[in-house]
Amino acid sequence: MYLYNLTLQGITSINCAVHGSFTGNSKQQEVCVAKGSVLQLLFCDPKTGKISVICSCDTFGIIRSLLTFRLTGSSKDYIAVASDSGRIVILEYSSQKHSFERVHQETYGKSGCRRVVPGQYLAVDPKGRALLIGAIERQKLVYILNRDAQANLTISSPLEAHKNYSICFSIVGIDVGFENPTFACLEIDYEDCDHDPTGDAYKHIKQTLTFYELDLGLNHVVRKYAEPLTEQGNLLIGVPGGSDGPSGVIVCCENYLVYKNLGDQPDVRCPIPRRRNDLDESERPIMIVCAATHKTKSMYFFLVQSEQGDVFKVTLEADGDLVTEMRIKYFDTLPVANALCILKTGFLFTASEFGNHQLFQIAHLGDNDDEPEFSSRIPLDEGETFFYDTRGLQNLILVDQIDSLNPMITSHIGDLANEDAPQIYALCGRGPRSTMRVLRNGLEVAEMAVSELPGNPTAVWTVKKNVDDSFHAHIIVSFTNATLVLSIGETVEEVTDSGFLGTTPTLGCALIGDDSLLQVYPSGIRHIRADRRINEWRAPPKRPIQKCTMNRRQVVISLTGAEIVYFELDMNNQLREYSERRELTSEVLCMSMSEVPEGELRSRFLTVGLADKTVRIISLDTSDCLAPLSMQALPAEPESLMVMETSSEQTGTTSIMHLNIGLQNGCLLRATLDQVTGDLSDNRTRYLGTRPVKLFRVLIQRREALFACSSRAWLFYNYQGRFHLTPLSYSALEHAASFSSEQCSEGIVAISENTLRILALEKLGVLFNQVVHKLKYTPRRLVVHPASQNMIIIETDHAAFTEKGKRRRREEMANDLIEMAKDQEEKALAEEMAHSLRNYEPDESIYGSARAQAGKWASAVRLLVPKTGQTLCQYELPEGEAAFCVELVNFRSQNDSTFVLVGCAIELELRPKRSKGGCVYTFLLTNNGMRFEFIHRTPTPHEVYAVHDFRGMALIGVGNLLRMYDFGKKKLLAKCENRVGYIFINILSFLIQKLLQICVNYKEGGKV
C-alpha cells in the first residue's frame, strides 16, 4: 500500500461567492463560497463580527460559477451550481442535517471546462422564474423554474438560445417584473473575422449588448434586441426594476459606466474616475472587475471595484421609468476581489483575488462626507475624466478575515525556529501585498487576558451560581496552601464571601444540584447552599482526601490507603454518603465519571486509574454500587482520566461513551466504554508531548471537548461531523477549565507558571495558524543558509517601478505640470501641485503599486530571519532586471566562503518573448550568514532561469546553454558549456549526487 496524497489544508482561494437566506431565517443572511471543488456556507455573526463555517462540502469537481435565487413567495434561497461535470445542480441547505441537499441535477453537456460547454456563466430572472446557463462560446440554455402541487421546486427541459460564432463576456438577468423573463448578454460576433484571411475585420470588430427573451406562453427563447457598443465592455450589472427601480443594465466598459435599457431610454454615460497623482500611464484604460448591488424598500445603490482596488458607490437618478443621471463617488480602497457581497446585517464580504478574504462592517454609506461626487451631467470632452484622492478606510471597518495562501509561489519545510516540530515557510501573494507566511500545525489562540498571581497555582476551575445561568460566576484558583476565589464580571476581582474555604488547597469544585456549590479539600467536603448555609463532611483523622471527581449529582473521593467513598445528592438536595466503601489494591492516581445523562439520575460508571498501571471500571448503579466491572492494563502509569459522551453523526444523539486516559509517558489513550457492561474496547493511542498528560472538560461550540495539557496543549473536539485532535500554537499550560462571560461567551481559563490566562479559540477546523511577514515584490524563490538558518528570498515584479523609477516618474510628471502653466497664477498653482506630487508616497500594501510599461521589471534580494521576520539586508536590482533563480554555492577555490548567486533576465518581454540577455549576481555571505555583500555581476547572452551548486562550481542554465562557472575576481569564469537544443533550461536538480536532472521548457510544452 502506498500513500497517494494527503490534503493537509484545503484550497483557500475563493473563485466565486453569493449571498442569501439559505437557512430560511429572513433576518439572517449567509455567504456561499466556492473554493475550487469545495462548497462552503459561511455565517457572519452580527454580534461578534466573526466568520464561521456552517457547512463544508467537497463536490469532487471544479465549481465554475454559483448563483442564488428565490421562488416568488418563498423565504429561502436556493443555490445553483455549474461545474466541470456538464450538469446544472440546484442545492438547498438543510438546517436539520447541517448539509446541502440536492434538489435537482440536470445533464446538459460533456464534462470538463470547455469553451463551448455551458457552465461559465449563470444568470437568473430576479423573480426566480427562469435560469440561464451559458458557455464562453456559442451555447446558452434556459431552464424554467416552477413549483409542483406540493410546493417543491421543479425545473423544465432546457431551451436553446445558441448563437454560432459568438463569444460571451457577461450575462445578467433583467428585472422586468412579471413580464417575460429577459436576459442581457455581452457578446462579440467573430464570424467575419473567422473568414477574413487578411485580419482587417478584427480591427473593426464590435461588441454587442444582446437581450434574450423567454416567451413563457410559447416556451421559446428569442433574441429580442441587439445594440453595438462604442467601448469594449467586460461586466454587466442588473438594475432593480418594477416598483424598486427603472430596470435595465449598467455596462462596465473601458473608462466608462453606461446605463442602457430597452425602449425610449437614452444611454447615460459616466466616466470612471482616476486617481490623482497616479504614476500609471494616462492612456491605460480603467476597468471594473466586480460589483455588488444593495437594495432596500426605499433605495438601492451599487458598489463597483476597479482593477486598482478602488471601490466606488454608484447611484441612478430617475424621472419615472427613465434614468436621467448617474452619479459615482469614491468609497474606499480594498484588495482586488473576485466577488463582493453586501449583507442585510451591514457587512461587506470580499472574496479577494489574492491574499486574505475580508469581512468589513459598513459604518457609513458615504452620503455625508466631503468626498466629491461626480455626475454624468458634468460636461467633459471625449477622453477626459474625473480625479480623486485615495485615503484610508473611512466608510468600512475591517472586523474579520479568512486566511488565504493564494497564490503560493513556493515553500520550504524545516524547523528553522528550533521548536522541535517543522514549520512550513510559504511565499505567497503578488506585488506589494506579497508575504512570507510561517505555518505551524496548531489552532490559533487569542489571548483575552493575562494576570499574574501571587504564587504558582496548582489548579483552576470555573463555577456557575445556578444551572440556568449562561455565564460563569467564579474562577477558583488553588495553590499549595490556599484557595483564591475570583468573581467574573466586567473585571475579574477577588471575593472573600463566596463560602469557599480559602486557607487550604482545593482538590475539586463544581456546581452541584441546581444552585449549590461543592468544594473538596484534603480535610473534607464543603457543601455551600444558595442561601449561604454550609454543610461539611470531615475526612477520617490522618487519612486525608487524595483524589476526587464529581458531577451535578454525584461525588467520589479517594482517601489515603486507596479507599473509595461515594456520595450522591438526594431529593432534598442533601449530600448522602453511600453506606459501603471500596478499598483498592493500589494507590489511586486519578478518577473520573461522566456528566449525568439526560433523563437519568446518575452516571453509571466510575473510572479509577491506579499506580499498578491499570484503570478500573466500577459500577455506581444502586443494585451493585462500587462493584468492579472491568479492568484495562496500561503501558504507563495514568496521570488523568476523562469520561465523555460523544454524539453519533447519524442520529445527533449522545450514544457513544469514550474513556480518555492521559499517561505519564506523554501519551493519550482513548477507549470505547460499553454503556451496558462497562467493558473497554477499540484502544487508540496518540503521543502528545514529553510531560504527563492532564485532561480537562471544556465546551467548544456548546459541545463537550477534551483539553489536554502536556509539553504542549491539545484540543480534541467535534467540528462539522469530524473529530479533530489539534495542538494549540501557544505556550505550555498546566491546568485549564471552560470559561464563559459576557465579554467572552466561549473561552478557556488556564494557568501557566504564575499567570492566569483567559483564552479564546476562534478559527476551529483550521490545521495551521499563520505568522505573516510582508514583502515588497512578488516572491519567486528562496534558499536557506544552513549555518544561520536565515533565508534568502528573491522578489520580482513585471511592469513595476523600482524606487528610483518612481522618483524619476514623479519628477517627470511634476515638470510636465510646470511646463503646461501659461501665466504666473497657473505657474504658482502648478508649483504647488508639483511639490505635492514629488512628496506623494502612498502605502502600496494598501493602495497597490503603479503599473509601468511592459518589459520593465523591479527586483530585490532579501536576507530575512524566518523566526522573527526581520530583514537583515536587502539589495535592489536596477530597473529592467528580473531575478528568477537563487542558489547557495561553495566554490572549491573559495573553501571558507558561501556565495549567493542570483540569475536574472534583462528587459524581458513576455509577448512576444524576447530580451536583451541575462546576468548572474554574486553576493558573499558574511558575519555567519547575517549579512551579504555584492561582489560582481556576470553578463550572459540569454536569460538565466536555473543555478545549482555542482562539485565546487556553479552549474547555470543560460537560455538553452548549460554552463559551468568558477569564481573570478571581477566576474564568474565560464569553464565549459553544452547546448541543449532549442529549449530553455528552467530547473536543475540532482538525484543521488551524480545523476543530473535537467527540466526544460519548449515553447508549447515541456520535457525532462
Describe these PLM feature segments.
Residues M1-V1008:
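Large eukaryotic, non-enzymatic subunits of multiprotein complexes that serve as scaffolds/tethers
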